């Protein structure tokens, strides 16, 4: 019910959602490709391992810039990695190559992920899984023998490389699973799950406390991520004795270097495996625990750290090569620290959003054992969480809007209309004035919040003049607001966004005491329903909205708008023929569900027309 979606598959900004896209200038691009990128790509084929290594590291850094990444992808970066580097004689290069593929999969989402999958990347992953299991087993056996002297530099480096390799492979699996639902479904097959479990089990046998914290977090991330997508995966884990024991005792105390990401992931795993069995008290404690884990992260400083990378130029001599390597290592260390903080906040927001959804599901479930939501949780939801969301709103806008959306709808379900007037006013100002900057996810999230807020502020479709919060938001008979939503609908072609615009307009139109605003919305709906080439989903949504808005003659806007505006004759003479024609074009075989919705809508429209005709004759 409350499965926490860690990130959207439509989003290609997991690795660095804060970085702005680079500029696009064809002449500059040609110059950059010829003078900067091609030499690096050519060095990937150099016979000198050090040249290949420096080139690969430099390319990895460049790929963090969206524009540079696109240029490199156009120059066939992925095929070069697959064909030349995954089987390189230098182990460091192989390990880093898988890491770069992971980054590209996270950044580019579907396109790169599906290309890798169709190029049989899973075979490379599993063959290296086998090597990792063997190496871990040998390492564990060697460490159990009496050590006459401390491990040498080569052994320490070999162990580091092994752990980095496991980290990159497991995180690549996570990246691929997030790139495509088809890939996810294949990864979740029993045979592939068992291959993944073999690696994780060997890591646990080696000793959690001896693993680098990054690898431990990656292991937790994989469990959290796949459990957020599949109940079957949870069953697989629960049926695995070693993994089940590990999760039963899972706590930050297991690892001496546990950080904010460790703590958030552990809470996330607990939430996924408890799901609807979770109590209200556990929900409350989990929210506070997650927020406490990220409390010391400054989102403003985090943005500055991520958006201001160092410039790493090409090496011109042996001494320069050494300096470049040092620069790259320093940069990677700082970047890794920033990305841990970034991912911690991302997952924390998603987890809180999922917990809110679970609370709503439990409250609405007739099978729930808990009748009332305790006062402590109510206080967390109404006072604590809004403060947290407001702190993070400017940096993690898209995610926070989803969190706000869930929280406001929960307020609606709980009939929590007596919220702080200051909170309502501040939140309304934020979502209505938010600059989406052509980010579709922000536009959809913003419109969803506006819809939920209207439901919260006007629960019965009535304006209460003594309510200062309603006066402060200046929403009574605001035709300009209605026109703004209509423009948003007309200027965008995304179905989900358009549907949310209709929901906002429909809810606003039903508020009595504002004839002008209702007229603006009613005429827009009626005119749209007479137009050709409107998607059937939109026609259905608008028609159903008309049923709700004008379903009762007692509404103060019914007589001046619906009756005197001649809506009934327009419905009979123009809308019915248009909908009949448009709905006929929906293929029953290709889209049976939509066809059924069209049929239901048309049938209801016929009944609605007859109802309004009888209503008018009765009132005359």
UniProtKB/Swiss-Prot annotation:
Presence of keyword Cytoplasm: yes
ARM repeat residues: 25-64, 66-106, 181-221, 258-299, 340-386, 435-470, 471-510, 564-607
Disulfide bonds: none
GO biological process, one term: ribosomal large subunit biogenesis
Protein purpose: Nuclear import adapter that specifically recruits the two functionally and topologically linked ribosomal proteins RPL5 and RPL11 (encoded by RPL11A and RPL11B). Guarantees that this cargo pair remains bound together from the time of synthesis in the cytoplasm until delivery to the nascent 5S rRNA in the nucleus.
Organism: Saccharomyces cerevisiae (strain ATCC 204508 / S288c) (Baker's yeast)
Complexes and interactors: Forms a heterotrimeric complex with RPL5 and RPL11A or RPL11B; interaction of this complex with KAP104 allows the nuclear import of the heterotrimer. Component of a hexameric 5S RNP precursor complex, composed of 5S RNA, RRS1, RPF2, RPL5, RPL11A/RPL11B and SYO1; this complex acts as a precursor for ribosome assembly.
Compartments where located: Cytoplasm; Nucleus
Cellular component GO terms, alphabetical: cytoplasm; nucleus
Protein name: Synchronized import protein 1
Keyword GTP-binding: no
GO MF annotations, alphabetized: unfolded protein binding
Residue segments, region Disordered: 1-32
Further remarks about this protein from its record: Present with 2600 molecules/cell in log phase SD medium.
Source taxon at top rank: Eukaryota
Entry keyword set: Cytoplasm, Nucleus, Protein transport, Repeat, Ribosome biogenesis, Transport
Xref: InterPro entries: ARM-like (IPR011989), ARM-type_fold (IPR016024), Nuclear_Import_Ribosome_Adapt (IPR052616)
The family this protein is said to belong to: Belongs to the nuclear import and ribosome assembly adapter family.
């Amino acid at each position: 019910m409350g499965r926490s979606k860690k990130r959207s598959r439509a989003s290609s900004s997991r690795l660095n959602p804060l970085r702005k896209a680079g500029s696009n200038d064809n002449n500059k691009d040609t110059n950059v490709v010829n003078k900067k990128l091609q030499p690096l790509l050519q060095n990937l084929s150099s016979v000198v391992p050090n040249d290949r290594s420096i080139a690969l590291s430099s390319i990895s850094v460049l790929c963090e810039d969206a524009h540079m990444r696109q240029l490199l992808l156009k120059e066939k970066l992925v095929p070069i990695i697959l064909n030349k580097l995954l089987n390189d004689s230098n182990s460091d290069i192989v390990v880093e190559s898988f890491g770069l593929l992971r980054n590209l999969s996270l950044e580019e989402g579907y396109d790169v992920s599906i290309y890798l999958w169709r190029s049989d990347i899973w075979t490379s992953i599993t063959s290296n899984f086998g090597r990792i299991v063997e190496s871990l087993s040998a390492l564990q056996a060697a460490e159990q023998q009496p050590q006459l002297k401390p491990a040498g530099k080569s052994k320490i480096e070999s162990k580091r490389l092994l752990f980095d390799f496991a980290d990159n492979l497991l995180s690549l699996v996570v990246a691929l699973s997030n790139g495509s639902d088809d890939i996810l479904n294949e990864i979740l097959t029993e045979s592939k799950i068992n291959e993944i479990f073999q690696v994780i089990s060997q890591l646990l046998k080696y000793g959690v406390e001896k693993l680098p914290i990054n690898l431990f977090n990656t292991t937790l991330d994989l469990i959290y991520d796949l459990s957020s997508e599949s109940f079957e995966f949870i069953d697989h884990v629960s049926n695995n004795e070693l993994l089940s024991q590990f999760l039963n005792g899972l706590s930050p105390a297991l690892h001496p270097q546990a950080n904010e990401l460790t703590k958030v992931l552990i809470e996330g795993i607990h939430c996924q495996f408890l799901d609807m069995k979770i109590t209200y008290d556990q929900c409350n404690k989990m929210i506070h625990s997650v927020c406490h884990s990220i409390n010391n992260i400054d989102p403003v400083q985090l943005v500055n750290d991520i958006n201001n990378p160092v410039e790493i130029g090409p090496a011109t001599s042996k001494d320069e090569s050494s300096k470049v390597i040092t620069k790259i290592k320093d940069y990677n260390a700082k970047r890794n620290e920033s990305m841990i903080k970034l991912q911690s906040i991302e997952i924390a927001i998603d987890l809180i959003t999922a917990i809110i959804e679970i609370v709503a599901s439990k409250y609405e479930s007739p099978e729930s054992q808990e009748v009332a939501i305790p006062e402590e949780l109510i206080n967390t939801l109404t006072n604590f969480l809004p403060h947290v969301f407001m702190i993070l709103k400017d940096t993690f806008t898209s995610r926070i809007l989803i969190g706000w959306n869930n929280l406001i709808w929960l307020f609606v379900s709980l009939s929590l209309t007596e919220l702080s007037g200051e909170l309502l006013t501040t939140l309304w100002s934020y979502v209505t004035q938010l600059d989406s900057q052509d980010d579709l996810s922000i536009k959809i999230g913003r419109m969803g919040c506006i819809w939920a807020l209207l439901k919260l502020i006007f629960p019965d479709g009535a304006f209460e003049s003594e309510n200062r919060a309603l006066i402060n938001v200046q929403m009574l008979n605001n035709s300009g607001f209605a026109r703004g939503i209509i423009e948003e609908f007309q200027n965008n072609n995304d179905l989900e966004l358009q549907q949310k615009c209709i929901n906002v307009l429909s809810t606003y139109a039903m508020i009595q005491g504002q004839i002008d605003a209702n007229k603006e919305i009613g005429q827009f709906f009626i005119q749209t329903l007479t137009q050709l080439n409107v998607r059937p989903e939109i026609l259905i949504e608008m028609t159903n909205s008309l049923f709700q808005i004008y379903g009762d003659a007692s509404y103060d806007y019914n007589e001046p708008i619906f009756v005197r505006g001649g809506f009934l004759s327009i419905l009979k003479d123009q809308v019915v023929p248009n909908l009949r024609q448009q709905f006929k074009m929906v293929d029953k075989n290709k889209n049976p569900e939509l066809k059924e919705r069209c049929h239901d809508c048309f049938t209801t429209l016929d009944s609605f027309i007859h109802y309004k005709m009888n209503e008018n004759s009765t009132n005359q």
